[in-house]
Structure formats: C-alpha cells, structure tokens
C-alpha cells in the first residue's frame, strides 16, 4: 500500500502463508517466502510494465519461484544493497546468498551456530554489501545468542559481544560504522525463559567512528567546523557545478567501503539507553544524533526518544500498542511504525505522526486455509519434535487418520478441537489448537432451534425449541414438528447451508416462515 494514499494492491492470493517480504533497492521487485506445496520457497514478484512506477498502482505483477525445490527450505530473504544478490536462510539454520543473474548460490554460514528449528535468525547486509551482521550462538551456549560479523563471501563468524546473556536484533547504523543491537546483559534476565529487560547498545567497527560518537555536543560541532575548514583549504569545497550532479550520477554512486578494525572491538561497545526496559525495536537517525525506541514502562509500548549527545530521554508519542516495530526509509526522512492495530509514518524532521490508511478486500477459501494449517502443523511436528521416534507414534499414519475429518469441518471452533486431539496423540505438553474469533467480523444470527437432520422434504424440520431462545416466548407459534421453509422470503433448499441467510441478521427483524 502507499504510505500517502489508501491505494492498495494484493500481491498473492493463496491459502498458504507468505512471510519475510522485502523490497529491492529499485522498489520494482518484492522477495518473500511461501509454504505452498508444503515447503518454504522463495518467490519474486515484479512490476511487469515499465511505465508503472510502484506496486500499489501496478496493473500486472509477474511472480516467479526462485531456486525451486521440494525438499530444501528457503526463507527470510533480503536484497543486497546493489540489488544483484539475495540473501536467505536455508533449512532454518544456514545463511546463504544467490546471485540473481547467474542463480549461483554460496554458503555464508554452515548452520553450526544456530540450534532453533523455528525458522530463522536475525541478519542484515552491510551498506557496502561486503559483510553481514547476524544473531548467532557461540560456544554451543544455546539459547543465549550473541551478535556476530561475517564476510558476505562466507567464513568464520567474529563474536562482537561475547556476553553470557541474550543479544539480538542487529542492524547497521551510522553509514555502516556501527551496529545497533539490544541485549539483556544489564537488565532482568530470562533465567526462567521469560521476563527479560533490555537495553539498546552500539558496537563500533572502527576507532574513528567510536571517537566521533563519544564527543560532547560542543566538541562535535567544533569537529565539524574544523573538517569543513580543512576541506576548503584543500580545495575540496563543493562548487556549483558539482551541486548540479544529475539524478543518474547520484544513482550510480557506490557506498564507501566500511572500515572494519577487529582489534580492540570489544572495547568499542556502548550502552545507549539509561535504564533497562521491556523494549521493542530501536532506530538511530541518519545523522546519528537521536535514538528512537519502543518501550513498555506502563503496560503497553510507547515511542521514546533519546538525544545521544545531550543524554536526554523523553516520551515522544503515547502509542499504547501491544506489540511494536519500526523501520526508517533509506533517506532517513521518515520512520514507519507498526503497532498491534495501526500503521503510521513519522516525519523525522517534525516528528509528527501521520496514519497510513489502506483500502483492500480479502477473499478467503476457509476450507483450503484449514487444510494448509493442518499440513503446516504436520510438518512442524515432523521437523521439530524433540523425540525422533515421535513418542512411538506413526506420525504419517496418524495424520492420515485425522485428515479425513477435514472435509466435514466448517468452522474454526471445531478445527481447533481437531488440532488439539491430533496433537494430543503425541502425549506432550504445550500443544493444541485455539480459536479466538474477531468480534469485528460479520455476525451470523442464531435462531435457537435444533433440527431433525433426517428430514428429507422441503425446508428444515424443527426437533426442539431451545429454552430462552428467540422463539421461546408465550406468543410463539414455533414448536417441535414445525417445518421452517423460508427466511425473509428466501426458500431453504436441501443443498443449502441455511446459516448464510442469517448473516448480519442478529438483533434485526427477521421473517421466518
């Protein structure tokens, strides 16, 4: 959808899950993963017509499978900064890269530093495309992860944090001169698998960036003036001709190579937040002056701001959201905020919030969705169950036995019960199915009648009037043995699900005859 208008384009329409969507640098290609056919695969969606500028207004979108396979799982794609390569996670543990022109694949990590089979881990390309920062587990210290650095060509991972506690969510900031991450090393730790309090921290790639960042506001301003004067003396001052660079020239500009100095890097780690808290995501402004972060001090998440030179922190926007994530555009002009019930854009200059609206219709094949979810549960247990023998259960045979009930289920309450009984065959804790209906959806009225399903004639033969239901009153003519033939004048046929005639009829006058 557009960030400025409610124009929205549907990219996929399948019962299977799609996840990990990302834009190419030119914004004309989307990469994502889908579990169609029972296996996570990478897909590319491209704007077909050159004259169409963006996805929300595109009329034709072409989709292709990248590296098709029925056995190898590929997920969580990310385009390289130049758009020529795509990184992804293979079989839930290995970081890989594919050249989009040649389709040649190379291995960056071998999977030995990740143990969870949940699906993937945090990673990010460096701005120059030569490095990855990633979340990994060193010294077999699962599940406590560190932040690592590895060449985009593959090789040994350098542990940047070496902490006994969990560090996560690494991202490149300050033009690639530092990595921002969150850690529980100072806060309440998850000794019992919950309750972590986190801080935002920086690890600097080189001494020069570290020294500049630690300058006071006054010293930093003096440093900028000095550098400006030095450029003027050296004759490097930008003249009018250079200011008139064309858009094409700017487009071809390559990012500077990042200077990585591993020696002494453990001494270039700084804690940014003044106190540990229940944090969401964090972002540093393009100029490196401000830290924005989500934190839940009073029940839910709000947006906080910290001046990194003055060391001043304040509540910027009261969001009151149950979960929160944010991302800055590549120009550093806008911050996009996602919450549990809203999307918003914040202008980085004025720090004003603007809601992002969308207009979209969604059609769902609910039976196909339930079949996909059933298959997803089957595969999750098959790949992730802690006991290779599946507690002695023939999982394929058990799956076939429960699959036969799927065609007879027409609601998610019953589907949740099916999943609970199906998973219960494994005799293990923390499994089962739940369904929480959305109260904002269409409401189907209930007549408070039970029917004789052996009735073969027209309409529905009433077997019982439910006590205290709509027809259980003194003047009601409806009783057991009555045949209900029409609802609001529409005839009930033998092959019809009559409940659709009651859609959105709750608390409304309805004629039953």
Sequence positions of predicted segments:
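Short loop/turn segments that connect beta-strands within beta-propeller blades
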Residues: 2-6, 47-48, 100-103, 151-155, ...
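Blade-terminus and WD-like Trp-Asp/Gly-His loop motifs, strongest in beta-propeller folds
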Residues: 20-29, 76-85, 123-132, 170-178, ...
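A short helix->beta-strand "capping" segment at the edge of beta-propeller domains
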Residues: 4-10, 59-66, 258-276
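A flexible loop/linker signature enriched in serine peptidases of the S9 family
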Residues: 1, 12-18, 28-55, 67-74, ...
């Amino acid at each position: 959808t557009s960030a400025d208008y409610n124009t929205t384009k549907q990219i996929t329409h399948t019962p299977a899950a799609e996840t990990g969507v990302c834009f190419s640098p030119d914004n004309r290609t989307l990469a994502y993963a889908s579990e169609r056919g029972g296996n996570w695969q990478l897909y590319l969606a491209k704007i077909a017509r050159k004259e169409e500028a963006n996805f929300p207004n595109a009329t034709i979108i072409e989709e292709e499978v990248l590296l098709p396979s029925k056995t190898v799982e590929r997920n969580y794609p990310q385009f390289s900064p130049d758009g020529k390569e795509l990184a992804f996670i293979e079989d839930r543990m290995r970081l890989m890269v594919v050249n989009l022109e040649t389709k040649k694949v190379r291995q960056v990590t071998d999977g030995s530093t990740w143990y969870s089979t949940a699906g993937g881990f945090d990673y990010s390309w460096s701005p120059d495309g030569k490095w990855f920062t990633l979340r990994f587990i060193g010294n077999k210290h699962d599940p406590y992860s560190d932040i690592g650095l590895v060449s985009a060509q593959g090789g040994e991972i350098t542990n940047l944090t070496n902490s006994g506690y969990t560090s996560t969510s690494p991202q490149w900031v300050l033009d690639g001169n530092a990595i921002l991450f969150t850690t529980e090393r100072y806060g309440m730790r998850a000794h019992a698998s919950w309750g972590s309090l986190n801080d935002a921290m920086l690890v600097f790639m080189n001494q020069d960036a570290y020294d500049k960042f630690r300058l006071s506001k006054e010293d930093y301003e003096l440093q900028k003036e000095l550098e400006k004067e030095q450029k003027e003396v050296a004759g490097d001052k930008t003249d009018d001709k250079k200011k008139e660079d064309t858009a094409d020239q700017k487009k071809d500009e390559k990012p500077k190579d990042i200077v990585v100095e591993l020696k002494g890097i453990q001494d270039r780690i700084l804690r940014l937040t003044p106190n540990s808290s229940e944090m969401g995501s964090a972002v540093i402004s393009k100029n490196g002056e401000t830290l924005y972060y989500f934190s839940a001090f009073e029940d839910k998440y709000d947006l906080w701001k910290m001046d990194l030179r003055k060391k001043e922190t304040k509540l910027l926007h009261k969001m009151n959201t149950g979960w929160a994530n944010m991302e800055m555009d590549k120009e550093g002009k806008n911050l996009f905020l996602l919450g549990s019930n809203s999307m918003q854009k914040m202008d980085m200059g004025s720090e004003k919030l603007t809601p992002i609206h969308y207009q979209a219709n969604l059609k769902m094949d609910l039976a196909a969705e339930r079949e996909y979810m059933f298959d997803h549960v089957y595969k999750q247990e098959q790949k992730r169950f802690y006991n290779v023998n599946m507690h002695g259960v023939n999982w394929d045979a058990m799956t076939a036995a429960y699959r036969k009930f799927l065609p007879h289920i027409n609601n998610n309450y019953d589907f949740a019960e099916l999943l609970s009984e199906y998973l219960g065959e494994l005799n293990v804790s923390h499994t089962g199915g739940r369904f929480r209906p959305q109260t904002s959806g269409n409401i189907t009225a209930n007549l408070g009648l039970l029917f004789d399903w052996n009735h073969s004639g027209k309409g529905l033969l009433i077997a019982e009037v439910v006590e205290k239901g709509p027809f259980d009153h003194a003047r009601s003519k409806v009783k057991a043995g009555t045949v209900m033939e029409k609802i609001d004048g529409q005839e009930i046929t033998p092959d019809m699900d009559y409940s659709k005639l009651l859609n959105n009829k709750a608390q409304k006058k309805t004629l039953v005859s």
